[in-house]
A protein has these predicted regions:
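Canonical tetratricopeptide repeat
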Residues: 22, 56, 63, 90, ...
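Alpha-helical segment of the N-proximal tetratricopeptide repeat
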Residues: 15-52, 56-63, 93, 127, ...
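Terminal, low-structured helical/coil segments at or just beyond the last alpha-helical repeat
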Residues: 1-14, 233, 241-270
Length: 270
């Protein structure tokens, strides 16, 4: 979800001589979130009722991973400007990171009510419904996101996930294919395509998609693991061991996936 939240082009426009706000937005575009936060702190000190400054401060905290401070800033922004759909959106994505999904969905609903054409709130709501395994509801909402922005690779990816979980392999495959057409290096969309192809029993094509996922992101351990399992089932044990080795290499030892891959390697290489 945090990747969705890193959208600063929709920040409220500065007005008057709000130099600190402008400098902060410039720093956000440069992905210098610490400098941006310093500027936004100055902005809210100079203009403590500026919802634009509070919203932007929230985005800086959000990108720095300080969700408690981000939520406080977004709450201040919505307090000063209750009609700000961006402030409600910011609250929503932060609440998702905090695991407060029901509250996040309420915030996204409020954002959509204020600005029905903002695809980001539709997208975030759809992905949150996926987190709650509410597949059919997610499908409806993600279609709404795509209607508003057909070029949103993340929305097509989410649509694919929901279709896959609802056992709609054909629809899932079409959605994942559209996602990677829009963003060729989207590793999770390639991974999803691989899963959809496996569900459709198109194993060789699935391996190609899983390989594309790990090419796009060599640390995509989910794709490495599924690739390894599939290769093992096909009897290609040397290639399977190499893929399990990639899982071990790229997964922290504290994560269950690391142990699973390590055990598979030990079993295949006694």
């Amino acid at each position: 979800m945090r990747a969705i939240g890193r959208r600063i082009d929709g920040a409220p426009a500065a007005s008057g001589d709000e130099d600190w706000l402008a400098l902060g937005l410039e720093a956000m575009r440069a992905l210098d979130f610490e400098r941006a936060l310093t500027c936004f702190d100055e902005a809210v000190t100079a203009q403590p009722t500026s919802h634009a400054a509070w919203y932007s401060r929230g985005m800086a905290f959000y990108n720095l991973g300080d969700d408690t401070a981000a939520l406080e800033s977004f709450t201040r922004a919505s307090g000063y400007q209750p009609q700000s759909h961006l402030a409600w959106y910011g609250r929503g994505v932060t609440l998702v990171e905090m695991g407060r999904i029901d509250e996040a969905l309420e915030a996204f609903d409020q954002s959509i009510a204020l600005e029905p054409d903002s695809y980001l709130a539709w997208l975030a709501k759809g992905m949150s419904l996926i987190d709650q395994q509410r597949w059919e509801e997610a499908l409806v909402v993600l279609r709404g996101a795509i209607e508003r922005h057909q070029g949103a690779a993340q929305a097509w990816y989410g649509l694919g996930v929901a279709h896959l979980q609802a056992n709609h392999a054909g629809e899932a495959l079409m959605a994942f294919e559209r996602s990677v057409e829009l963003q060729a290096d989207f590793d999770l969309a390639w991974y999803g395509k691989g899963l959809a192809l496996l569900q459709a029993e198109r194993v060789e094509e699935a391996l190609e998609a899983l390989t594309a996922a790990t090419t796009a992101n060599p640390q995509c351990t989910l794709a490495w693991m599924r690739q390894a399992e599939t290769l093992e089932q096909l009897g290609r044990l040397e290639a399977a061991c190499a893929a399990y080795g990639q899982v071990v290499q790229h997964t922290p030892t504290t994560e269950p996936l690391h142990g699973q891959a390590q055990r598979q390697l030990q079993r295949l290489r006694p």
